[in-house]
Amino acid sequence: MLRWQTAGESHGEALVAMIEGLPAGIHVTTEDIVGALARRRLGYGRGARMKFEQDKVRMLTGVRFGETIGSPVAIEIANTEWPKWTEVMSADPLDHDIPREGRNAPLSRPRPGHADLTGMRKYGFDDARPVLERSSARETASRVALGEVAKQFLEQTLGIRTVSHVLSIGGAGITDPQNAVLPKPEDLEALDASPVRTLDKTAEQQMIARIDEAKENADTLGGVIEVVVYGVPAGIGTYVESDRRLDAALASAVMGVQAIKGVEIGDGFLEAMRPGSQAHDEMAVGDDGRITRLSNRAGGIEGGMSNGQPIVVRAAMKPIPSIPKALRTVDVTTGEAAQAINQRSDNTAVPAAAVVAEAMVRLTIAQYVLEKFGGDSVAETKRNAESYVASWPEHMR
């Protein structure tokens, strides 16, 4: 069983990520992880932190000479700003009182749309600092690191490849997903070269203009992202229990990314507006004599199982709640009306969210692939998968 967990705070000494259940023999290096984390920092509209934040990575366990060895893989991502926060975020009690000002000023004006107020209520804090430190999207660096390990596993065993892109930001760009061309894995370099991670140059300019407008207005923007997975064989996931459906797991994984407010598979909500005769993917016999689909409205999943088509996961991200134009709130110390705290943040992080969602999709697919095929080594997993596909009648492959 593949399991993963992350630990660490936004301004703590380091983030730590661990993944357990991977087979031995996956080729993965520190350089791979560093490259993946660099992709997360890309994107027009990111804040100042992205300019000086360096992800210093250490592979702590589970990898030897660039290959997994079957034991849990642990990865540390050091916080280069830690020297500025050693007192504020000290794990141990301090011998002296810290002045309640500057970085250590109590954060008593919770932000609407953030975890601040509810987190303070839930855990009994009188300061939002402990809440925002863990709920911060900085934590997603850990998941991107683990997603890179999952990427290497999927590519090396079954040739499964994943790519993400941005459809729209702040309502600008490709607002009708039916008009979007699905990117291919070979488009990854071009996507990462785009300031907003799109292949559509017209949409790119529209999104950049909308971000510039938000900057001028001291505001933030959300958007819509899409992740596409190629090469997943039919039959990953199952219909026999609701919690084992692949689409349910993918939706949960992506919904768990900070600021994501909605997830759909394939045409999703558009399907609700179509008659049945126009909603489903009809089948035919292809030129090679095998069963093929005439469309992919289901997004590669039917009955909770992959059907062999590309898997398409789309998600909506809300605007970041740390807004320079501070929203109205209540100071929990005084009980009086106030303006919300404004922590350093981005105008938009939609391009980065696409990279994070990509990582979560990879982790989920890897989990379900291992559930289906098992294997203590990459070679064994690969043999099991090949045997499974070979067991189908020729016309069903």
Swiss-Prot record:
Q: Which PROSITE patterns match?
A: CHORISMATE_SYNTHASE_1 (PS00787)
Provide the binding site for NADP(+). Answer: 40, 46
Q: Which Pfam families match?
A: Chorismate_synt
Which cofactors go with this protein?
A: FMNH2
* GN (gene name): aroC
Q: Which UniProt keywords apply?
A: Amino-acid biosynthesis, Aromatic amino acid biosynthesis, FAD, Flavoprotein, FMN, Lyase, NADP
Listed as disulfide-bonded, the cysteine pairs are none
* Subunit structure and binding partners: Homotetramer.
Spell out the residue ranges making up region: Disordered. Answer: 101-120
The record's top EC class is lyase
Q: State how the cofactor is bound.
A: Reduced FMN (FMNH(2)).
Biological process according to GO:
amino acid biosynthetic process; aromatic amino acid family biosynthetic process; chorismate biosynthetic process
Which named protein is this? Chorismate synthase
Q: Give the record's family classification.
A: Belongs to the chorismate synthase family.
> What this chain does, per the record?
This reaction introduces a second double bond into the aromatic ring system.
- The EC code for this enzyme is 4.2.3.5
Q: Gene3D superfamilies from the entry?
A: Chorismate synthase AroC (3.60.150.10)
Which terms does the record give in the GO molecular function aspect?
A: chorismate synthase activity; FMN binding
Catalytic reaction(s) noted: 5-O-(1-carboxyvinyl)-3-phosphoshikimate = chorismate + phosphate
Q: Binding of FMN: at which residues?
A: 134-136, 258-259, 303, 318-322, 344
Source organism per entry reads Bifidobacterium adolescentis (strain ATCC 15703 / DSM 20083 / NCTC 11814 / E194a)
UniProt pathway annotation? Metabolic intermediate biosynthesis; chorismate biosynthesis; chorismate from D-erythrose 4-phosphate and phosphoenolpyruvate: step 7/7
GO terms for CC? cytosol
